[in-house]
């Protein structure tokens, strides 16, 4: 149930972001000559003191660190499961590789590798889906297996395979899971792509392509999860104790294939390359975005420290290393869930930036005081809800995904403060 509502929320969020935000943000940013999200906020609200730039840059660094940690964690799990290595050693080696090509190659290296890695990821997803279905003996057998579990295919109940219990998805739980879609309104790396669109006429085509692709990708991901249970039931992959362990499903499929000749082993290799590609592609993009926020938005724009091009690049490289060290510390636990780490970072960006972006584009009365207050309120609520509310009220009505309450609070604060300080 959680996978279905998350996938649906992301699909809807993608379409709405392209439909409502893309064109307005592209036109507005070109009109005020803004090239980054902190720059857009500062110029849109006439913040000459660059307070908005400073706050937004700090938020970008804070929430890109766990994003980067999730990539390191995934790489560590991959090599640990594949080669029987110690998780910490595997994670450190993976992090070192990413750090090296980010610091030496910079944005060109990340852009080129992202392009190649996206192709590998797509092929890997399709191979996993096809081979997984083939190993079970067709989709009929796949769904026959899962239908035996009460609530597994019921999106209002769900079934926890690890605990062996049927869940209950009420309206509030559904709404909070669908709230994943709200995160798109505040994702800096996605919004930057809107700002960089060259031909406005291609927006409609781009929206259609992006929306269709997300639906296909989310659909395949959900199907892989369903197939994964059947593979587990047939003894092809091990029995997983929890959601964190279940994240090794694709690795285990690849390891199983490697035992059956060169062709199967080659297919398994592509699958593993797809996992590595997805994690490295994510980690390098987040590292460079965070480093850019420090060297450009924070140091040079907010603190008014002028740097030569060489010193700016050096500072960015140092920032990559420092951010990576913090991310490595966060990723040190082999039992941590990649999905949970990503969900926290996603909520942070969605709640801190999403309401501000929407108000900046659609409500003329929004001012810099409202924007700053809303940004801080949304980001802070994510921490409070995640580590205080959900921890102390687990299993109650308050135990919902932190993005929903944080987004609502951030939006409310923007409106209230803007009206009080007009």
Regions found by a protein language model. Give the residues of each.
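Membrane-embedded helix-loop-helix hairpins and adjacent transmembrane boundary segments
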Residues: 1-422
């Amino acid at each position: 149930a959680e996978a279905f509502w998350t996938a649906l929320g992301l699909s809807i969020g993608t379409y709405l972001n392209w439909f409502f935000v893309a064109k307005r943000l592209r036109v507005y940013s070109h009109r005020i000559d803004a090239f980054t999200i902190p720059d857009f906020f500062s110029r849109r609200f006439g913040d000459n003191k660059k307070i908005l730039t400073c706050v937004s840059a700090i938020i970008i660094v804070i929430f890109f660190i766990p994003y980067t940690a999730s990539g390191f964690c995934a790489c560590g799990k991959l090599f640990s499961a594949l080669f029987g290595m110690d998780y910490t050693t595997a994670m450190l080696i993976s992090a070192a590789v990413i750090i090296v090509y980010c610091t030496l190659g910079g944005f060109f290296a990340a852009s080129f590798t992202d392009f190649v890695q996206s192709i590998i990821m797509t092929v890997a997803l399709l191979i996993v889906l096809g081979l997984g279905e083939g190993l079970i003996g067709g989709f009929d057998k796949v769904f026959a297996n899962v239908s035996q579990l009460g609530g597994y295919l019921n999106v209002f109940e769900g079934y926890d395979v690890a605990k062996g219990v049927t869940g209950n998805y009420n309206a509030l739980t559904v709404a909070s899971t669908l709230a994943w879609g709200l995160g798109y309104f505040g994702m800096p790396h996605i919004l930057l792509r809107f700002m960089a669109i060259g031909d406005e006429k291609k927006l409609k085509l781009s929206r259609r392509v992006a929306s269709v692709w997300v639906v296909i990708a989310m659909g395949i991901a959900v199907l892989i999860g369903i197939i994964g249970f059947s593979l587990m039931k047939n003894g092809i992959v091990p029995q997983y104790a929890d959601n964190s362990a279940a994240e090794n499903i694709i690795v285990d499929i690849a390891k199983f294939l490697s035992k059956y000749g060169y062709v199967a082993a080659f297919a398994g290799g592509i699958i593993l390359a797809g996992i590595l590609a997805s994690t490295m592609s994510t980690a390098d993009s987040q590292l460079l975005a965070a480093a850019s926020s420090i060297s450009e938005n924070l140091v040079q724009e907010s603190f008014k420290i002028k740097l030569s091009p060489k010193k700016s690049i050096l500072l960015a490289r140092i920032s990559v290393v420092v951010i990576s060290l913090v991310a490595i510390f966060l990723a040190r636990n082999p039992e941590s869930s990649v999905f949970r780490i990503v969900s926290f970072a996603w909520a942070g960006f969605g709640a801190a930036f999403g309401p501000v972006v929407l108000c900046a584009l659609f409500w003329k009365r929004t001012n810099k005081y409202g924007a700053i207050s809303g940004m801080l309120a949304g980001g802070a609520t994510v921490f409070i809800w995640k580590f205080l509310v959900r921890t102390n009220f687990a299993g109650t009505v308050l135990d919902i995904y932190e993005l929903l309450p944080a987004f609502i609070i951030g939006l409310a604060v923007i409106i209230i403060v803007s009206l009080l300080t007009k």
